[in-house]
């Protein structure tokens, strides 16, 4: 079964993503900050990380840079309100394969 890590500090969006992806049969670990995400990554292998950029204890760019060397096969997709082209470029440079802006 596919394992997904959701790193999103908006509790409602976090729960909505978790609910819908679990309905589709995915195993979800959802966290609200970078520290807890880093801890989860030490003990789990995820196929996908859905990652917000603006987190209360750090940013998604730095977390993505930590993920990729240790978990090169893990796909990272940014899901963020940051919609500037420069933000997207930073996301791809950090190792993400896609960048989705939320309203």
Language-model segments: which ranges?
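N-terminal/domain-start alpha-helical segments
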Residues: 1-103
């Amino acid at each position: 079964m596919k394992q997904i890590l959701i790193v999103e500090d908006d509790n409602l969006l976090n729960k909505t993503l978790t609910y819908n992806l679990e309905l589709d049969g995915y195993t979800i670990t959802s966290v609200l900050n970078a520290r807890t995400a880093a801890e989860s990554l030490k003990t789990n292998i995820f196929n996908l990380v859905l990652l917000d950029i603006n987190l209360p204890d750090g940013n998604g760019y730095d977390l993505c840079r930590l993920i990729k060397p240790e978990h090169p096969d893990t796909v990272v997709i940014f899901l963020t309100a940051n919609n500037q082209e420069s933000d997207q470029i930073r996301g791809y440079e950090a190792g993400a394969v896609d960048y989705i802006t939320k309203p």
